[in-house]
Amino acid sequence: MAVPPSAPVPCSPFYLRRQEACPQCSWSMEEKAVASASCWEPPGPPRAAVPCFAIAVDQDDILPGALRLIRELRPHWKPEQVRTKRFKDGITNKLLACYVEEDMRDCVLVRVYGEWTELLVDRENEIRNFQLLRAHGCAPKLYCTFQNGLCYEYMQGVALGPEHIREPQLFRLIALEMAKIHTIHANGSLPKPTLWHKMHRYFTLVKDEISPSLSADVPKVEVLEQELAWLKEHLSQLDSPVVFCHNDLLCKNIIYDSDKGHVRFIDYEYAGYNYQAFDIGNHFNEFAGVNEVDYCRYPAREIQLQWLRYYLEAQKGTAASPREVERLYAQVNKFALASHFFWALWALIQNQYSTINFDFLRYAVIRFNQYFKVKPQVSALEMPK
C-alpha cells in the first residue's frame, strides 16, 4: 500500500508570538535573525493557537502543578474526580496522565522536562515538530505549553516492547508509518541533516564539561574526537536522503492501536530533518531494548530485508528491486554506528545532569562497546553497484 507524500504545510517565518508571561514560548529578534540565517530545521505550521501558561511544575511533586494546568484545560472537571497515572518508562522527562473516565478517552498527558535537558533538546523545535506531525495526521493534539513542559492528548493503544517490534505484522505497520513521516516536505527549503550539528554539540559538552570525571570504561576524549571525524567522513559519502525523521524510535515511542490496526509514534524531542538511514538504523538498534540491553535481539539480515522492502514499497508505491533493498540495508547498518555514538554521548551528558533514576553511565558504556564491536564488520559492508 503506497503512502502518498504529504502536502507542504503553509507557514509564516518563525511564527511565534511573544508572550511575556512565558519566556519558553518566545523568540527574541536576535534569535529570529540567527535562525533565519542558519536554520537547521525548516519552520513548521503556525503555533499561535497553542496556549502557553506561566506555570512551573515541580519535578519532585508533579501533582499540584498538573492540577493547576488541568483547571485551565478542563475547567468542567471536578478536582476531586481527577484521577492520575504516572508513567515511569521515560528516561528524559516525567509524565503524568490526568483523566476522569475509566476508559481514559479524554486524558491529558502532562510532560515535565527533565533537569538540564535544554542542553540536549531544542524545546521550541520540539513544539514545531509536534505541530508539523499533527498537521499530517501523525501526532496527537498539543493542548498547551508551560514553563517547563507541555500537555497533549493521550493516544489510545499500547506502547510496544522489544518482543513486539520483531513480529512481522507489527514491524510492517512500523515501516509504513516511518515511510509516511519520511515523506513530510520541508516547506520548499533544502534541509540540512541535524546529525552532525547535534553530535558535535554533544561532544563539545562532553569534552568541556564532563571529560575530567569520565569513567575509565569510557573512551578518551581524543579517541571520541577521532571517531566522530571518521563517522562524518564515511557516512556523508553514502548519499542517504535527508528526510523528516523521528530520530528516537525506541519501542515505548511506538503506540499500537489494535482497534484501528495502525501504529503511531510519540515523543518528538529529537525529531527533525536527518538522514533516512539514520532513522531506520537507530530503530533497529532499539530492538535491543533500553533497560535490559541485549544486542542478540538486533534484527537478523532476513528481518531487516523484509522490513526495508515494506518501507521502500510504501514510500515508492511500487515494488522495490533487490538492489534498492540491499543498498538501503548497507546504508542503514552503517548509520546504526552513528546511532550508537550519538546516544552514548547523550547518556554521558544525562549522567552528569539528570535526576531520573537510570544508570546513564552504564548505558553509555554499553553503546560505546557495541559501536566498537560492530564497526569492523559494518565498515566492510559494500554498497551495491
Curated annotation (Swiss-Prot):
Keyword Protein transport: no
InterPro entries the record matches: Kinase-like_dom_sf
GO molecular function: ATP binding; ethanolamine kinase activity
Keyword Kinase: yes
GO cellular component, one term: cytoplasm
Disulfide pairings: none
Keywords from the named record: ATP-binding, Kinase, Lipid biosynthesis, Lipid metabolism, Nucleotide-binding, Phospholipid biosynthesis, Phospholipid metabolism, Transferase
Pathways involved: Phospholipid metabolism; phosphatidylethanolamine biosynthesis; phosphatidylethanolamine from ethanolamine: step 1/3
Entry's Gene Ontology BP terms: in utero embryonic development; multicellular organism growth; phosphatidylethanolamine biosynthetic process; placenta development; post-embryonic development
Entry EC no(s): 2.7.1.82
Reaction catalysis annotation: ethanolamine + ATP = phosphoethanolamine + ADP + H(+)
Functional description taken from the UniProt entry: Highly specific for ethanolamine phosphorylation. Does not have choline kinase activity.
Similarity comment: Belongs to the choline/ethanolamine kinase family.
Protein name per UniProt: Ethanolamine kinase 2
Source organism of this protein record: Rattus norvegicus (Rat)
Lineage of source species: Eukaryota, Metazoa, Chordata, Craniata, Vertebrata
Gene name for this UniProt entry: Etnk2
